[in-house]
Curated annotation (Swiss-Prot):
UniProt similarity note: Belongs to the MalT family.
InterPro entries in alphabetical order: P-loop_NTPase, Sig_transdc_resp-reg_C-effctor, TPR-like_helical_dom_sf, TPR_MalT, Tscrpt_reg_HTH_MalT, Tscrpt_reg_LuxR_C, WH-like_DNA-bd_sf
Source domain of life: Bacteria
Name of the protein in question: HTH-type transcriptional regulator MalT
Oligomer status and interactors: Monomer in solution. Oligomerizes to an active state in the presence of the positive effectors ATP and maltotriose.
BP GO annotations: positive regulation of carbohydrate metabolic process; positive regulation of DNA-templated transcription
One family name in Pfam for this protein: TPR_MalT
Gene field: malT
Origin species: Salmonella heidelberg (strain SL476)
Activation/inhibition comment: Activated by ATP and maltotriose, which are both required for DNA binding.
UniProt entry keywords in alphabetical sequence: Activator, ATP-binding, Carbohydrate metabolism, DNA-binding, Nucleotide-binding, Transcription, Transcription regulation
Record: residues binding ATP: 39-46
Span of domain HTH luxR-type: 829-894
Chain residues forming the annotated DNA-binding region: 853-872
């Protein structure tokens, strides 16, 4: 819940001096990316900019405090301020910020700029007190913000120092409007206006000018002069002499003498107590100070000129001038040290009543009240956890004694989930084991089940499926139905384990249950995870169209719940890329893989390994070996600098072995084969994949017998477990083994099986990747004219892809080949006497490649009637009457020229 006052413009007071000369300068702010107002405390930065902002509707205001160094808090308020300025135009960014569903601040800002691209009017965002930001991540994000913000957007930053925002670069490019302390200092005319409005008796212009010079135009000093003169009934000049040469670091003594010591005891205590509040309203004041009418007291303090300012138009929220507030808090620690814990406790209670648990935690921590902190956490910690207030929770839990956690084991569970979210898996188990050992009395069975659900998640994340399954089952046996979150976790883990074990049907059922529960209880990250798992299972079963439709539902969920920045989004676009690759939609597959890399741009490079593998696959399917080699260099570097799941290693090894196959690199394949451990089982898609890599390397090395043993066992497992996509891949590799070992009948048999199974999977690229050996076999099958219609159509499609991306046959009928052919001593006399035109040679090559007339017309970009004319002419010149005769004639010519066909 956001505090309204932090998003409200300070109210312009009637007695303030209108800084016309500075407002004139600010009037051109829309011509700059950044308007920067810097000066020490008390020079009127906020007052000036609030004057300039008056009347501007499309302007957001964000007042910072120390707590805004938390990235999530900063993001929530910044987006909320822009939403105020745009009237709710950026709803997707707002939802992502509220739900903490973004990978980083920069990725959130990137989404924001996408939405702002449709906003065409000038837009302003004011960030006040930026000097309070010390988090380098926020500085980096704001530099990104400034580089990429729309042209019609101006950022206005108020700070006591020069912020780390790439100021020099903006200045060089004339994109920076600057106002500093020298310009902010009051001139003589402004000082005269100020005193005329503040003092009951007017003073001479020369006198006000002298006082202005004495304090170097410092607005706070001028305000103190006027306040002191009113309180002490002394001359303003006397106060000016005392303030001459003073600066903020020496202001404390003056404020004690001239402000605190000149108010009554009741007002003094009010000032000191209320100063612990970063912002305040009537209810907070009543509870913290004991005053009966907080609003009336605040307005009275405001009238006395005691540095209190309104934070919103309704006058409900107030705050002290930062300089005065800091002074008061320091004095409060000295003068009211004994009462201070109780004051903070009162503030925490009031914040809780108003629904701001994070502010309440701030005061409970300041009070050192472990019991109050514990009570707040017991009631609100899980809500804060689900809103990613992780840093605040970690600080709070560290402040509680271990005994308090043991007395409230759900807080131990919370601490363990915090560790799990930070991938500190070993610490999770250590913490839970210690808690179970030290908790007094018999541990509640439900809590024990929640511990087991978390342990199960840790185990599966850490690559221990057996332990994960045991713990998940224990948790599900003991958890009541109402304990939905832990039941979702345990059900998801159990489903994932069954996926690993190859029990696809049961795994799919559990993942569908997980999705239903997660959607019902708005646990969106588990809903997304379950959909991704369902899609992977359907892919493994060979139901690629069903997998596609499940992915569509997942993309819709991401859009509806604004989950674009979750790392899981990368998982989804990656499996979409795998599916697109299988269907030979290579451009789309590559784009999807690159979008996955973009999602992970703020993570370690190792996280991009899977998407990089897909980019290599796309290059290999296109026959672009140079590009594949370049990408493989990067992939192999990542492999050597990280620890990966066996699925990741299997996919990376796959593209390496295929590359070695296409380039004939037996040395690399042999070296890899020597050092690669053989999996113990082959009961899931990633273990099948690694065994297939081993068999492919063995085939490349001519080790046909062991490769055949591997592939036959893989097929047996795949059939038993209904791993139909793996069976399709295995058949294609077995086909290559038979083809290369001269067992042409066996090769044709398994190729027919693979084509038939591809009617279910839709595979294209898995055939294409085998290159010319596959093309030769498909041509022969097409020439036999015995394939069923669907298989015939697929075979022709695969041939087109091979011809497009690999060393295709009609390339042999180029000008150089034809010249060598005509000079060959065994060339048929008919071809010498009636030579084909270059276009006719191209048409012959395409006929041999299995193209239909329509496909040839499309390939050569000519009309179908023109192709018929070319075919009639070349038939006549070759002395043939039928298409099959032309294919056989082309085959004879290729054999004569030394090409294996």
């Amino acid at each position: 819940m956001l505090i309204p006052s932090k998003l409200s413009r300070p109210v312009r007071l009637d007695h303030t001096v209108v800084r016309e000369r500075l407002l004139a300068k600010l009037s051109g702010a829309n011509n700059f990316r950044l308007a920067l107002v810097t000066s020490p405390a008390g020079y009127g930065k906020t007052t000036l900019v609030s004057q300039w902002a008056a009347g501007k509707n499309e302007l957001g205001w964000y007042s910072l405090d120390e707590g805004d160094n938390q990235q999530e808090r900063f993001a929530s308020y910044l987006i909320a301020a822009i939403q105020q300025a745009t009237g709710g135009h950026c709803s997707t960014s707002e939802a992502m910020a509220q739900k903490r569903q973004y990978a980083s601040l920069t990725s959130l800002f990137a989404q924001l700029f996408i939405e702002l691209a449709q906003w065409h009017r000038p837009l302003y965002l004011v960030i006040d007190d930026y000097h309070l930001i010390t988090n380098p991540v926020i500085h980096d994000a704001m530099r990104f913000f400034l580089r990429h913000q729309p042209e019609n957007f101006t950022l206005v930053v108020l700070s006591r120092n020069l912020p780390q925002l790439g100021i020099a670069n903006l200045r060089v490019r004339d994109q920076l409007l600057e106002i500093g302390s020298q310009q902010l200092a009051f001139n003589h005319q402004e000082a005269k206006q100020f005193f005329d409005r503040r003092l009951s008796s007017p003073i001479e212009a020369s006198e006000s000018s002298r006082m202005c010079d004495d304090v170097a135009g410092w607005a706070t000093a001028l305000q103190l002069i006027a306040l002191s003169a009113r309180q002490n009934h002394t001359s303003a000049h006397h106060s000016a002499r005392r303030l001459a040469g003073i600066n903020a670091s020496h202001l404390s003594d003056y404020l004690v003498d001239e402000v605190l010591d000149n108010v009554d005891v009741s007002t003094r205590h009010f000032l000191l107590k209320s100063a612990i509040l970063r912002s305040m309203n009537d209810a907070l004041i009543v509870r913290v100070t004991g005053e009966e009418n907080g609003q009336m007291r605040l307005e009275e303090i405001e009238r006395q000129g005691l540095f209190l300012q309104r934070m919103d138009d309704t006058g409900e929220w107030f705050s002290y001038h930062p300089l005065f507030g800091s002074f008061l808090r320091q004095r409060c620690q000295w003068e009211l040290a004994a009462e201070l814990p109780e004051i903070h406790r009162a503030a925490a209670e009031s914040w809780m009543e108003q629904g701001f648990p994070s502010e309440a935690i701030h005061h409970a921590l300041a009070a050192g009240d472990a019991q109050m902190l514990r009570d707040i956490l017991l009631n609100h910690a899980w809500g804060l956890f689900n809103h990613s207030e992780l840093a605040l929770l970690e600080e709070s839990l560290k402040a509680l004694p271990w005994e308090s956690l043991l007395e409230n084991p759900r807080l131990v569970l919370l601490q363990a989930w915090l560790m799990q979210s930070q991938h500190r898996y070993s610490e999770v188990n250590t913490l839970l084991a210690r808690a179970e050992q030290e908790i007094k009395g018999v541990m509640d069975g439900t809590l024990h089940a929640e511990f087991n659900a978390l342990r199960a998640q840790v185990a599966i994340n850490d690559g221990n499926p057996e332990e994960a399954e045991r713990l998940a089952k224990l948790a599900l046996d003991e958890l009541p139905l109402a304990w939905f979150y832990s039941r979702i976790v345990a059900t998801s883990v159990h489903g994932e384990v069954l996926h690993c074990k190859g029990d696809l049907s049961q795994s799919l059922s559990l993942m569908q249950q997980t999705e239903q529960m997660a959607r019902h209880h708005d646990v969106w990250h588990y809903a997304l995870w379950s959909l991704i798992q369902q899609s992977e299972i359907q892919f493994a079963q060979g139901f690629l169209q069903a997998a596609w439709e499940t992915q569509e539902r997942a993309f819709q969920l991401i859009k509806e719940q604004h989950l674009e920045q979750l790392p899981m989004h990368e998982f989804l676009v990656r499996i979409r890329a795998q599916l697109l690759w299988a269907w030979a939609r290579l451009d789309e597959a590559e784009a999807s893989a690159r979008s996955g890399i973009a999602v992970l741009s703020t993570f370690q490079p190792q996280q991009q390994l899977q998407c990089l593998t897909l980019l290599v696959q796309c290059s290999l399917a296109r026959g672009d070996l140079d590009n594949a080699r370049s990408q493989l260099n990067r992939l192999e570097n990542l492999l050597g600098n990280g620890r990966y799941h066996c699925d990741w290693i299997s996919n990376a090894d796959k593209v390496r072995v295929i590359y070695w196959q296409l380039t004939g690199d037996k040395k690399s394949a042999a070296n890899w084969l020597r050092h690669t451990p053989k999996p113990a089982f082959a009961n899931n898609h990633f273990l099948q994949g690694q065994w297939r890599n081993i068999a492919r390397a063995q085939i490349l090395l001519g080790e046909f017998e062991p490769a055949e043993i591997v592939l036959e066992e893989l097929n047996e497992n795949a059939r038993s477990l209904r791993l139909m996509s793996d069976l399709n891949r295995n058949l294609l590799l077995l086909n290559q083994l038979y083809w290369q070992s001269g067992r042409k009948n066996d090769a044709q048999r398994v190729l027919l099986d693979a084509l038939q199974l591809a009617n279910r999977t839709g595979f294209i690229s898995h055939f294409v990747i085998e290159g010319e050996a596959m093309a030769q076999q498909l041509r022969q099958l097409i020439q036999l004219n015995t394939l069923p219609e669907m298989e015939q159509h697929r075979a022709q499609r695969i041939l087109r892809e091979i011809n497009q991306h690999h060393r295709h046959k009609f390339a042999h009928f180029d000008e150089g080949f034809v010249e060598r052919l005509l000079n060959h001593p065994d060339v048929p006399e008919l071809i010498r006497t009636s030579p084909l035109t270059q276009r006719e040679w191209q048409v012959l090559g395409l006929i041999y490649s299995g193209y239909s007339n329509e496909q040839i017309a499309g390939e050569l970009a000519v009309a179908a009637t023109t192709i018929k004319t070319h075919i009639r002419n070349l038939y006549q010149k070759l002395g043939v009457a039928h298409r099959q005769d032309a294919v056989q004639h082309a085959q004879q010519l290729l054999k004569m020229m030394g090409y294996g066909v």
